Structures are given as structure tokens and as C-alpha cells.
Regions:
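A short glycine-rich, aromatic-capped structural motif
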Residues: 1-80, 181
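A generic structural signal for ordered secondary structure
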Residues: 5, 204, 235-237
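Short loop segments at secondary-structure junctions
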Residues: 11, 190, 205-207, 238-241
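Intrinsically disordered, low-complexity regions
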Residues: 12, 25, 52, 162, ...
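Residues within well-ordered beta-strands of beta-sheet-rich folds
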Residues: 35-37, 187, 234-236
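Functional-site microenvironments in short loops/helix caps that host divalent-cation chemistry
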Residues: 57, 68, 72-220, 227-229
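Charged DNA-binding/catalytic regions of mobile-element recombinases
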Residues: 223-224, 241
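Short, structured beta-strand segments at or near domain termini in extracellular proteins/domains
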Residues: 229-241
Length: 241
């Protein structure tokens, strides 16, 4: 199973400007060199790692209905397969018996039940940071999109109400497909730990979203245990130069 990736070099663009439209806060991020997959993980790639056969007609569709935690675990499994150093250390303990006193929103596991730490020097597969994702999506462009939306993305106005295989639309200038539209993509970052706890950032918009949801700067959040039919993920690797 080949993961086609492109290299984004540090300094390829100016420090990326990030915006939190909820609070109005702005900041810049200096992004190190990294590799990022040209497509989101497909159902065929997901099943191949697990030794499961895939209907050829379904193999090129994005792998969806996958939680952030499942995506992190997949990254580590891929790293071990390719003899790379896993980027994540995952810790789990048995969950305590729940009561009204220990209930959390959406029955979300408490932080001490499932934890992930990221070794930022490891060369294994991982999820992109929100800043890395944004740099890769822009591919040196400016403005809310890197091209005409109908040409580059599957979204509400052209998807006919269902998901499509990857890489059918025009890629961006760096050869990445479907960074807008298609499926939302998990990022590493927490959205706002003080307000939303462990909720993670998702980017890019999906096949059922209106045009305003498919813009480079759009940041949304969801529970790391959540899994939806328009949410997938894209592999990234740290590169030391």
C-alpha cells in the first residue's frame, strides 16, 4: 500500500496567519518541513492495513465514520508497518463506573481514560496540525479558496447528496486533492481546551456542506470520539532536515 505524499518545506510560504472567528483572536505559526498525503486515507488503504478485502468499486472512497482516536491509532499502525518511529504514545485505563457525578457531555471519556502524547521529532505518520493543514490547503494561494469551487471540490451544490471517490477534482498547486470539500479532515489540535475540553479541530468542509463551509479559513470542532459520514483524515509526517 503506497501513500503518495508531497513535501512542504519550511519557508515555502510566510508564517501562516490563523484566525479564531469565535473570539476574533489572530496569530501566526511558523511551520516546519513536513510531508502530507495527496489524498485523505481511503477505504482501500484502511482495509489493506487490517488485511481486509475491499470491493474494488469502493476502494477509492474516503474512509469515513472514523473518530479522532481511531485515526491516531491508524497513524501508529501505519508507522509500525513502514518501520517508522510512531509519533504517538497512547495510554488507556479502565473507565470508572459512571454516576451522575462522573458523567461528561455526550458521555465523552474523561481525560484520564484515554490519553495521547505526540513526539514531535518522530518520523512516523500522524495527523496534521491545523496550521500545517492550512498551509498545505492554500499551496501558496491567497483568499478563501485555491480555485473555482466546482472544479476543486465536492460540496452541496454538485455532490448530488453523496460522497465521491478521492482525486476526481482538480488538485491544488502542490498536488493535493480534495482539501476543500469531499470530507472534513481531522487535525491534531484541540479547538479551545478551556472552553471545549478535548474537542478537536476539523477542516476543509464536506460533500454536504454549502459553499461557505468550504473555505481555507473555516475551523470547526467535534468530540474526538465522534464519527460521521463526511469526516475522514489525511496522513502527515515530520521531516528533519
Amino acid at each position: 500500500m503506497l501513500i503518495d505524499m508531497v513535501r512542504v518545506r519550511r519557508g515555502a510560504t510566510a508564517a501562516e496567519a490563523m484566525v479564531d472567528r469565535r473570539t476574533g483572536r489572530t496569530w501566526t505559526v511558523d511551520v516546519r518541513t513536513f510531508d502530507i498525503a495527496t489524498t485523505v486515507v481511503t477505504l482501500g488503504q484502511w482495509n489493506a492495513l487490517r488485511g481486509t478485502e475491499t470491493d474494488p468499486s469502493q476502494a477509492a472512497f474516503p474512509k469515513v465514520d472514523v473518530s479522532w482516536r481511531q485515526a491516531v491509532a491508524f497513524c501508529n499502525e501505519m508507522s509500525l508497518r513502514d518501520r517508522l518511529e510512531p509519533a504517538y504514545t497512547i495510554t488507556t485505563i479502565d473507565a470508572p463506573t459512571r454516576s451522575h457525578a462522573t458523567w461528561t457531555p455526550h458521555d465523552e471519556p474523561a481525560p484520564y481514560e484515554w490519553g495521547v502524547t505526540w513526539d514531535r521529532e518522530a518520523n512516523g505518520y500522524r495527523l496534521p496540525t491545523a496550521a500545517e493543514w492550512q498551509v498545505a490547503c492554500r499551496a501558496g494561494s491567497t483568499g478563501p479558496r485555491y480555485g473555482d469551487l466546482d472544479e476543486i471540490a465536492w460540496y452541496a451544490d454538485n455532490s448530488l447528496g453523496f460522497m465521491h471517490p478521492v482525486a476526481e477534482k482538480t488538485p491544488n498547486a502542490w498536488g493535493l486533492f480534495d482539501t476543500l470539500g469531499g470530507v472534513w479532515e481531522w487535525c491534531w489540535d484541540q479547538y479551545d481546551a478551556e472552553v471545549y475540553g478535548s474537542y478537536r479541530i476539523i477542516r476543509g468542509g464536506g460533500w454536504s456542506d454549502p459553499h461557505w463551509g468550504c473555505r481555507v479559513g473555516v475551523r470547526r470542532k467535534t468530540n474526538p470520539e465522534a464519527a460521521f459520514d463526511d469526516l475522514g483524515f489525511r496522513l502527515t509526517r515530520t521531516i528533519t532536515e
